[in-house]
């Protein structure tokens, strides 16, 4: 599945144009509980939605590390209102939740089984990251917790249709979160580059990510400028593109034990 991506400070201008490509009367918005407003997304998204003749149902009542119960609750809401397009605005967990909702709305199967059956067409999914780190906007994986154990759900249909990487959403990110998210992106780029399944294309994406992240990440943590934020956002996207091809290796395998609770 091919994904469309818009990068940079003018990328947000494409959101309304993309939404107008689809025929729908009810939009499902998956968003962060607090970040949606603090990053400046709320005013922008409200203005865009006002240009559309549609209702909007919001879903934000879920854990930072989404649980299977959060997924089930979101699916009930999505089905109740018969929404026909999904937009996600938030960090990695928000984007993962939207990806899982879109996937399991159309596919049956126990989320941690790895065995899924398509039952109906996928809903369009547009994602807008508000952090520069996970690369979730560019991958066909999503993380889910079941009984306090971390699982990765993988399927080509999990990849969002459209990613809009609008760096200004990251301009107010706190220092600690900037560092954690940025190091996540750098680690994924390196992990993809040394991967046994690396390809010419994944190497190109990984190198592009490293070239953007390596010099700018320390600066964006200690004395950020908008230009640096732009480069780190772009680097995180390319890191996601790289690891989407190679998949993960030992660092991610170790992380599952560290992040299970």
Enumerate the predicted regions with their spans.
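ATP/NTP phosphate-donor binding region
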Residues: 1-85
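General beta-strand structural signal in soluble alpha/beta enzymes
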Residues: 6-8, 58-60, 87, 127-128, ...
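Active-site nucleophile and cofactor-binding loops and adjacent substrate-binding regions
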Residues: 63, 89-91, 247-251
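Glycine/threonine-rich beta-strand-loop-alpha-helix active-site module
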Residues: 69-167
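Carboxylate- and glycine-rich phosphate/diphosphate-binding segment that chelates Mg2+/Mn2+
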Residues: 141-246
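Catalytic phosphate/nucleotide-handling subdomain of diverse soluble enzymes
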Residues: 256-261
């Amino acid at each position: 599945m091919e994904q469309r991506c818009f990068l940079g400070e003018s990328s947000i201008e494409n959101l309304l144009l993309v939404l107008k490509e689809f025929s729908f009367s009810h939009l499902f918005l998956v968003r962060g509980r607090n970040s949606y407003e603090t990053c400046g997304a709320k005013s922008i998204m409200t203005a865009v939605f006002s240009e559309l003749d549609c209702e909007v149902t919001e879903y934000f009542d879920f854990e930072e590390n989404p649980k299977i119960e959060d997924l089930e609750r979101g699916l009930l809401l999505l089905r109740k209102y018969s929404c026909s397009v999904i937009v996600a605005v938030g960090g990695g967990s928000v984007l993962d939740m939207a990806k899982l909702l879109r996937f399991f709305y159309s596919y049956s199967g126990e989320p941690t089984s790895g065995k899924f059956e398509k039952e109906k067409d996928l809903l369009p999914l547009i994602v807008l990251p508000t952090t520069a780190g996970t690369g979730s906007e560019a991958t066909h994986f999503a993380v889910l917790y079941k009984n306090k154990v971390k699982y990765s759900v993988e399927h080509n249909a999990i990849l969002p249709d459209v990613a809009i990487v609008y760096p200004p959403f990251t301009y107010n990110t706190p220092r600690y979160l900037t560092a954690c998210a940025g190091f996540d992106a750098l680690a994924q780029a390196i992990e993809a580059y040394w991967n046994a399944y690396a390809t010419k294309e994944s190497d190109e994406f990984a190198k592009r990510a490293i070239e953007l992240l390596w010099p700018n990440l320390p600066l964006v943590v200690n004395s950020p400028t908008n230009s640096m934020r732009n480069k780190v956002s772009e680097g995180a996207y390319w890191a996601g593109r790289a690891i989407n091809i190679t998949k993960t290796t030992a660092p991610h395998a170790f992380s599952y034990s560290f992040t299970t609770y």
